[in-house]
Amino acid sequence: MVQQLALFSAIEDESYPLSVETLTILSSNRPRLFANFNKIYKPNPSLQIEKVNAKNQLVEQTRVKLSTAVPLSKLGNGAELNYHFMEKLSNDDIESFNVKSYIQDIDSNNKTNWAFQISDIPAAGNNRKLSSQTIHESVIQSSSGSVSSFIDELGYVNDFQYINVGVKFQFLSGVVMEIYKVWQVVQKDQEVSMKLITKDGFMIKAMYNVNKSTDIESLNNGSQLLLKLKTDLRDYIELDIPDRKCMDTRLNHLD
């Protein structure tokens, strides 16, 4: 479990090169390209699930997320890629990426590593300067069958899925910053298609993870680091807190 402090923003496509250059200088590290395939599941509505715990308290059902890294070789047909690759991604399809073949491969491979994640809605408060969210995560290294059958046994069914591709900056202070695009992945019968959600721009996330929510010193340190970064970037990127409802994983939200 981690307590994640975060700030968010968005930039237009034209601002990407300058943003990368600025963050490379601030972080003292070159950007690292990443890609993740994410599957969101919700509790199976056909199952009768208790909505109260042992203390007779109401428990709201939440979505869970499975994520796995997409090999960069899959994105570029084996070619070596760097941060400039992101400048070519402005369409619904990633030309060099066969999403249907990729999904078939990972669905049939029970050795694929998946991150299994459950997250709470960020803490409320009118005077908050940062988003603060509790995230529970475990790693599934293998399963006896496909990941779909594994998640089905847990009582969950598919809700939606997406791919995010971007660059990541690791600051010496422990702050991590990501600039990325998001594609919704739609499966209908035997067909698989992608739809670019972040058209004409990029999402940005700056985060700092603390292992224990009771570690006040680390939480204060992370808060100071993120707020300083916000000040340093004020002429380039407007980091802010999103509406906490857009990060709400509870089942009744967005239904």
Swiss-Prot record:
Subunit structure: Component of the Mediator complex.
Gene: SRB5
Function field: Component of the Mediator complex, a coactivator involved in the regulated transcription of nearly all RNA polymerase II-dependent genes. Mediator functions as a bridge to convey information from gene-specific regulatory proteins to the basal RNA polymerase II transcription machinery. Mediator is recruited to promoters by direct interactions with regulatory proteins and serves as a scaffold for the assembly of a functional preinitiation complex with RNA polymerase II and the general transcription factors.
GO terms under biological process: regulation of transcription by RNA polymerase II; termination of RNA polymerase II transcription
Name of the protein this chain belongs to: Mediator of RNA polymerase II transcription subunit 18
Keyword Magnesium among record annotations: no
A family per Pfam: Med18
A cellular component annotation (GO) from this entry: mediator complex
GO molecular function: transcription coregulator activity
Alphabetically ordered keywords of this record: Activator, Nucleus, Transcription, Transcription regulation
Main localization of the protein described in the UniProt heading: nucleus
Family: Belongs to the Mediator complex subunit 18 family.
Compartments it resides in: Nucleus
